[in-house]
Amino acid sequence: TVNTDGSYNFTLQGPIDHAPNSDELILNFPIIATDFDGDSTTATIPVTIVDDKPTITDVDAISVDEDDLATIGSDQSNPVSIDGNFTTTQGSDRVVSYQLDGSATPVDGLKSQGVDVTLAETANPDGSFTYEATAGNSAVFTLTVNPDGSYNFTLQGPIDHAPNSDEL
């Protein structure tokens, strides 16, 4: 709405599609001001629409016990596989997937029995992503992130710890 005093109001009444990987869209509304004797001038009313983003909160901290791996052989009283959840607040666009940040390096410097750990991602038909960590040919852990915000971590092999440390 443009008022006679030159002020204007823009009301967004629903979501607007943005270009892929774009967080804002600029709409330029050309306006003409004309006076009583017909003189006119033009300008543009720029309206920037910022795309809201989803937020992730309440990420469950999980803990597994390496000494309960079958190959280690302790009392098997603690889990080596555990489920967790996180909460997502969606913006006007629905969340279509959850996966690890490709620019992050969560296993950098991680070793299992002296061998560097590498992480491989698999996109599954159900929309989940599975991350398999290996050291050479040995499985170290698997992380599956599901489309509903739940995840499962399964420890499959030992992880090297700092001297005199039991936790990583």
State what each model feature region is:
Residues 1-168:
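Acidic/polar, solvent-exposed loop/turn segments
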